[in-house]
Amino acid sequence: MARGQQKIQSQQKNAKKQAGQKKKQGHDQKAAAKAALIYTCTVCRTQMPDPKTFKQHFESKHPKTPLPPELADVQA
């Protein structure tokens, strides 16, 4: 039964190592993506990463609504 005990110890050691690496890494891709979405459409509440995309979205999805003042000088 020595191998069974070694296997359990190896699994515990590996789990501890994996947990340490996760803590060290500390980067969450979903959180980073969410932080990048800083522009929110006033009509449909869709979030966009930059003003150019925001203006393109607004012109294509809400053509009858007047452009917000923050998009007036943006080059699309």
Curated annotation (Swiss-Prot):
Compartment(s) of residence: Cytoplasm; Nucleus
First and last residues of each zinc finger (C2H2-type): 39-62
InterPro entries referenced in this protein's UniProt entry, alphabetically: MBS1/2-like (IPR045230), SERF-like_N (IPR007513), ZNF706/At2g23090_sf (IPR026939), Znf_C2H2_type (IPR013087)
UniProt biased composition (Basic and acidic residues): 53-62
Gene Ontology molecular function terms on file: zinc ion binding
Low complexity bias: start-end ranges: 1-13
Residue ranges that the Swiss-Prot or TrEMBL entry lists as coiled coil: none
Biological process terms in GO annotation: negative regulation of DNA-templated transcription; negative regulation of stem cell population maintenance; regulation of translation
Designated name of the protein: Zinc finger protein 706
Xref: Gene3D superfamilies: At2g23090-like
Keyword field: Cytoplasm, Metal-binding, Nucleus, Repressor, Translation regulation, Zinc, Zinc-finger
Keyword set includes Nucleus: yes
GO CC entries: cytoplasm; nucleus
Origin: domain of life: Eukaryota
